[in-house]
Amino acid sequence: MLLGCNPSENYLKNHEVFPYSMEIVKKKKYKISVKEANDLYVKYLYDRKKIKDLNYDKTFLSPTLIIDDHYVYSFRNLVMKKVAVFGVWINANTGKITTNDESIWLEEKDIFDKNSKP
């Protein structure tokens, strides 16, 4: 692989990416709370019939990532230690829902390395 061709590193250079944490949410002072985003996400899933019998009260939901002021509901590969960029994005200030189909997996190590730099 050529240097500089790592899709994870290239994506991180052009976007503000954090692993989801309440600390980041509080620091950013978003207008849409995680609870509100979760409610929007569940409604989105129900409206598209992706989940038929979801009992929200008994289901723990949280975004996987925060990217460019969006709560991102995506996938984590625990074995390969990667997190997907694709999935459902909810704007943390407006509540607007979009889907991202970019087939990019970010290395968890790269995310943490970027955020640990001063």
Where are these regions (language model features)?
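C-terminal motif of bacterial Sec signal peptides marking the signal peptidase cleavage site
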Residues: L3-G4
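Short, non-transmembrane alpha-helical segments in secretory-pathway proteins
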Residues: S8-L61, I111-P118
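Exposed beta-strand-loop-beta-strand "reactive/processing" segments of non-cytosolic proteins
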Residues: K52-T99
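C-terminal partner/receptor-binding element of secreted or periplasmic proteins
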Residues: T94-P118
